Amino acid sequence: MLVTAYLSFVGLLASCLGLELSRCRARPPGRACSNPSFLQFQLDFYQVYFLALAADWLQAPYLYKLYQHYHFLEGQIAILYVCGLASTVLFGLVASSLVDWLGRKKSCVLFSLTYSLCCITKLSQDYFVLLVGRALGGLSTALLFSAFEAWYIHEHVERHDFPAEWIPATFARAAFWNHVLAVAAGVAAEAVASWIGLGPVAPFVAAIPLLALTGALALRNWGENYDRQRAFSKTCAGGLRCLLSDRRVLLLGVIQALFESVIFIFVFLWTPVLDPHGAPLGIVFSSFMAASLLGSSLYRIATSKRYHLQPMHLLSLAVLIVVFSLFMLTFSTSPGQENPVESFIAFLLIELACGLYFPSMSFLRRKVIPETEQAGVLNWFRVPLHLLACLGLLVLHDSDRKTGTRNMFSICSAVMVTTLLAVAGLFTVVRHDAELRVPSPTGEPYAPEL
């Protein structure tokens, strides 16, 4: 398993580098890329945001292993994960309103403080302290995915008066480097866990200086900005109306809730499936992230002028890949017949599918959901998503250890088949919708049906 993990990591990384280099050579330079003021503004944002992302990714490979190292049972670990998911959905519902009221810069500093406290709790073996740490982690995650982006958009448009059309370029580059940071974080986590002598808690300790630097740079380099948004109740009410009045939005919500709840369960299960067979967890995690990066690169190539596939096609492909992978896992995790290499390959395919899924879903959401209703609609999307993930973990909590993992993958397979039916329903609804097609090189919607 050790050799398989390292060979897979090297092969995936080489594939990603080759695709990205060829894409960069073929890409024409844009006006935004040569604007010194814009580049400096991007740099001020990236140096804070990337530190926050690096600290977040550094903790991911060893979270389950840490709880296992503290001799908690799988059911107890499942409850810790459920607590984290529940706090994420609760804080996620109010995060945007909190950030707008408190201030985006202060919210980013608050993120660095709460996430540092979350890491400190990992030094304790007390179950209640770890539960508190998971709650703090949920708050921190909600702030990470709301405060930083909100700060950037306000500064970009209101303070610097750059064209709004340049915003996607910033976040596209951020998405790419987010994958790169995730790959590097897995290698770093493996190194510190193996060499420092602290064991699985080492990556959490190593994340604290990064978080402190995140808060310090935000305090020093960023200006404060606020936004008076409409009331939280009105935001949710408007989002619910949009969700129920447009079948496309409803189907997108169903697909997101089902697909991403399965991914949350995968995040919980990969460590207990591979760790008993001597897998280097940090390198395995980096391989996962490299597979996801490869999927994102393939998405960009597939939707380019040369191939011109549509996001709807790639969303369907992503779901099909996950269905196939989960069927593989159902057999490769059978008690007494475990095949860790086959399970590892299935996990890599799931991550590859995620690399196709997330940009496809982002494109479709952006086209289908009105900008004024996106916050409210996404809040409604997140509730069933996290509830399904929590339910799955609770079912696993009550299962027999020997058969529980296999049974959970069987349930996830059924969920993904349902997701595939929802994708087919969405495909039927939007097949004549030119708005949901990537524009052709001539600027006209691509002629063939979705």
Curated annotation (Swiss-Prot):
Question: What are the recorded Gene Ontology BP terms?
Answer: monoatomic ion transport; response to food; response to starvation
> Localized where?
Cell membrane
Q: What organism, scientifically named, is this protein from?
A: Mus musculus (Mouse)
**What is the protein name stated in its UniProt record?**
Molybdate-anion transporter
Cell membrane found in the keyword field: yes
The record ties this protein, via Pfam families, to:
MFS_5
Q: What is its main location?
A: membrane
Keywords for the protein's UniProt record, in alphabetical order: Cell membrane, Ion transport, Membrane, Transmembrane, Transmembrane helix, Transport
InterPro entries, per this entry? MFS_trans_sf, MOT2/MFSD5
